[in-house]
Amino acid sequence: MKRLWFIVGLFFCCISVQAEKRALIIGIGTYPDVDYGWPVIHGDNDIVFAKTMLVANGFKAGNIDTLRNEQASSHAIGEAFKRLIATAKTNDVVYIHFSGHGQQITDLDGDEEDGYDEAWVAYDALQEPTPNYHGEHHITDDQLNAWLKQLRQKVEINGRIIVVSDACHSGTSTRDITEPTEIRGAHSKFELNGIKRPYKEQRTIEWISISACADNECNRQHRLSDGKQCGSLTYALYLLRDNLSTIVADQLSALLNKTINELVKRPQTPLVELPNANNQYLFE
C-alpha cells in the first residue's frame, strides 16, 4: 500500500511540474492626447495577430494575458509581469510581445555604449522630460531585464523566454508623406540632463530577443487589404505561424527578413538575438 501511495504521489508531482506555454501581449495604438507627443499608430491591431499565432503554436487562450491601449499603463505592465513571474514554472515557454512606440532614453547605469537605453513607451509615458516627469513611465531595457531575470529563475535553464518588440527607437514619430503607412518610434531622444553614468559591463543574452528593425532603421507598418494597419514584424510572425513549430531559432532571422521586406517594400532588417542554445525550436 505504501508503494502504491508513493507511485500516486509521484504521478501528481510530475503533473504539477508539467511545462506550460504562457504569454503577455501589449498593444498600444492610441496614446492619451497630443500633449503626450505621440501620434496614433496601430499597435492595438497587432494583438489579434499575435494571439492567433500563439494559439496555433500550442498556447492556451487562458494563458495569454493582453493589455490594450489605456490598459497598458506602466503600472499595469509591471503588474502583468508580476503575474507572469508568479505563475511561471520550471521548463515553461514564456512569450512577451510589445507593439507600440519605442524611444531612446538616457542610460542611467552605464551598460549602453551609446549612452542610451531603449525603452518601450507605455500608455502614460511622455515624449519629453518636464519638471514633473523624468521617464518614470518608460519601460527601459534595464527594467525589462530585471523582470526577465526573475522569469529566467522561475523557468530555469531549460525554459524558453521569447521577447518580441514591434516598435522602433530611432524612427520618425510623424507620418512620412511619401509612405502609405505610419512609422513607429520617436525621432527625438528622451534626454535627462546632469546624469553621471557609472561604467557597467554589457549583459549576456539569456532569452530570445526579436526586434522589428535595426537601431538605424524605421519600423514601417503593413497595410492590410481592408485598409487597416498592423506591425510588420507581428504580421510576419502571423504569416509564418504554421511553420514556427518546425523552425530552428537561428533560422528565424532570414525568414523574417524575407517576409517583412515583402510586406513593407522598403529595406528593414529584423534582429534576432539568441542565447547559446540557438539550434532549438522556437516554441518547444
Predicted regions and their residues:
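Hydrophobic h-region of N-terminal signal peptides that target proteins for export
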Residues: 5, 9-17
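Cysteine endopeptidase catalytic domains of the caspase/legumain-like
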Residues: 18-284
